[in-house]
């Protein structure tokens, strides 16, 4: 096998760069400097030797083979939200250059390349009145979201993003191209639905589509000081048997106040009784109710979480209905944030997410949760980071009686993998050992293979 030093030789690098149909930026070039930190979270060390923007799957194969043969650190980036999509003196594959989308209206499926954002996909599928359940922010990368599970506004009514994945194209650590479906390789697609970044470079996904056009949205804003009572009422109601899967609630504790978004995936007539019930909780200072396009819903908080800042976050799961004690802990913690540059976000789960699936269908471990909660902070300066990390740890500790697990798409990466992958951990270790014994794909929420 070639050494890292040998692959640093100009001739070998030149030959590789010339073989790529896409674009390659070398460390030290002006283009490299302009592109190396084009990412959502810049609180990372990212110093690759090469940045490769592939034009096609053959470029991906060449990048994998070159990195493996030269023993280079290898990482993949797409939407640039991932905390782990970085490498040191290795090869960074920026797959955001691959954005083709093909909708099959008759079969209600879509084949989408991994470089697409959620917004890219929504824009195309909405032309047909169709869509998939995805996340909360349109500039999130579709690839990373899907491979970690995929939680968002429509999870209760349509399941996780990865639940709607029916196939994909993968380049493995040997540089081989595989078409992966339940029929062709059931154990591998099981692993991809929740831990997929560990097993290869996914170059495209095939999803089943659902009729998705407009949603009935109620937005209610409460002052921090008076929000405990309406949130307690909401917590009790949202977890009751009266609430259908089509209704979900997103709660955001922000500097502007406590924002409740009650989302009904259906018609105004169907959703009105549920949204009006939530509107009756407390006295909101803002109350807006209307039908809006789903694509608009997915963009509502885009400007609150822009690219190019330093972020820190954790994302555990809540195992029961929101109650007064839990809400008091959350509100008190928000008020004690050291820099006030934070938001606490709760996504309503249950519904389709909780419906039983076969153990070999998906490696997502936290289906029995009521909510996912994210403690998200902007880091104003490097000096603030220790206090922000301590604040996050403290609020997480206080919520431990109600919380479990962590979400691979929002974890800080310091937790044991058992916290992320739960009951699936041992099986995933076995599959990692089988499909990536060298741990070539390690810049992720990493599952280490068994070493002989």
UniProtKB/Swiss-Prot annotation:
Induction: Down-regulated by Pseudomonas aeruginosa, PAO1 strain and PA14 strain infection. The keyword Flavoprotein applies. Its cofactor is FAD. SUPFAM superfamilies: FAD-binding/transporter-associated domain-like (SSF56176). It holds the Pfam family FAD_binding_4. It comes from the Eukaryota. Its EC number is 1.-.-.-. Residues 44-212 form the FAD-binding PCMH-type domain. Belongs to the oxygen-dependent FAD-linked oxidoreductase family. This is FAD-linked oxidoreductase DDB_G0289697. Keywords: FAD, Flavoprotein, Oxidoreductase. The modification Pros-8alpha-FAD histidine is found at residue 81.
